[in-house]
Design a protein with these regions (language model features):
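Blade-level signature of beta-propeller repeat domains, shared across WD40, Kelch, NHL, RCC1
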Residues: 206-215, 224-242
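Loop/turn-rich, solvent-exposed surfaces of beta-rich toroidal or solenoidal domains
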Residues: 140-174, 178-206
Length: 242
C-alpha cells in the first residue's frame, strides 16, 4: 500500500512470492477541503490488530481510517469503509504516524505546526490524549518519528530552523510524553532510524550529504554525537533490513 503525496492518492499493489510488485488492484483519490487546500497523503500504516489501515493527509489535516479485508480474494479490493478517524487542528499538517510497542497508543508528528500528538487506539477508534510542541525551532518542517526498541523513548526530527532531534520519555501506562532533551544535527534531518540493538541513532542529513551517527543512552534516551558519518548524496530515508 503506497501513499502518494503529490497526487493525493493511495495505491494498493499485489506482491508475488519473491516480494516483487505486481499489478495495482486498488486506487483511491482524495479531494481537497477547498480549492486552495489539496490532498497530500503522506503516510499509510496498518493498525496493530491488522484490521484497519490509517492514512495521514497533510493537506486536509485528517487521519483517515480504512477497513482492511485480509480475506479478500486475490486481486480484489482490500480497503473499504473510508472514515475520518481524527481531525487534526487546522494548519498542523499531519505527516508520520507510529504505534507504541503494545499497540495501545499512536504517536503523530505534524509537519507544519511542529506538534507531537499522543492518540489512544482501541478497536479501530483513536482519541487524543496529549498534544505538545516538539519542534523547538518552530520552522514548519517536522519530519520523522520513531520509538526506541525497548519502547521507552520517542524521537522526532525537525528541519528548516534549529535542525535536530527532540527526545521524549514515554509513560508506559498512560502513553504520555515528557520532553527530556533536544539534539542538534546536520542540515535538514529528513529521516532517521534507530539500530535494532538500540545503541545508535542514524540521521539522514539531506543537505549535508551525510548520514550522521549518534550514540544513544538506553537509560536516559539522550544522544551523543560520535563525530562519525557516512557520506551519501542527498540521503532521504534509512531502513534496516530484517
Amino acid at each position: 500500500i503506497t501513499a502518494n503525496y503529490t497526487g493525493g492518492d493511495i495505491g494498493v499493489f499485489l506482491l508475488d512470492a519473491a516480494g516483487k510488485l505486481q499489478a495495482e488492484i486498488q486506487y483511491i483519490a482524495f479531494e481537497g477541503r477547498t480549492p486552495e487546500r489539496v490532498a497530500h497523503v503522506h503516510c499509510m500504516i496498518p493498525t496493530p490488530d491488522g484490521k484497519y489501515v490509517l492514512a495521514t493527509d497533510l493537506g486536509n489535516d485528517h487521519i483517515y481510517r480504512f477497513r482492511y479485508n485480509q480475506e479478500a480474494p486475490q486481486g480484489s479490493v482490500v480497503l473499504t469503509d473510508q472514515q475520518i478517524a481524527y481531525q487534526v487542528s487546522d494548519g498542523q499538517g499531519p505527516r508520520h504516524l507510529i504505534f507504541s510497542k503494545d499497540g495501545r497508543f499512536a504517536y503523530l508528528i505534524n509537519e507544519l505546526g511542529g506538534e507531537c500528538v499522543v492518540l489512544s487506539y482501541h478497536k479501530g477508534k483513536i482519541k487524543e490524549v496529549q498534544r505538545l510542541m516538539a519542534d523547538e525551532g518552530q520552522g514548519g518542517g517536522s519530519a520523522d518519528i520513531h520509538i526506541s526498541p525497548d519502547g521507552r523513548f520517542l524521537y522526532t526530527s525537525h528541519r528548516l530552523k534549529k535542525d535536530g532531534i527532540s527526545i521524549f520519555a514515554i509513560d508506559p501506562k498512560r502513553g504520555t510524553l515528557k520532553k527530556v532533551g533536544y539534539q542538534l544535527t546536520g542540515i535538514h534531518p529528513r529521516n532517521f532510524a534507530i539500530t535494532p540493538n538500540g545503541k545508535y541513532l542514524l540521521v539522514a542529513c539531506r543537505d549535508d550529504n551525510k548520514i550522521q551517527v549518534f550514540q544513544r543512552n538506553a537509560t536516559t534516551g539522550t544522544l551523543t554525537d560520535t563525530s562519525q558519518y557516512i557520506s551519501v548524496d542527498k540521503p532521504t530515508c534509512i531502513i534496516f533490513a530484517k
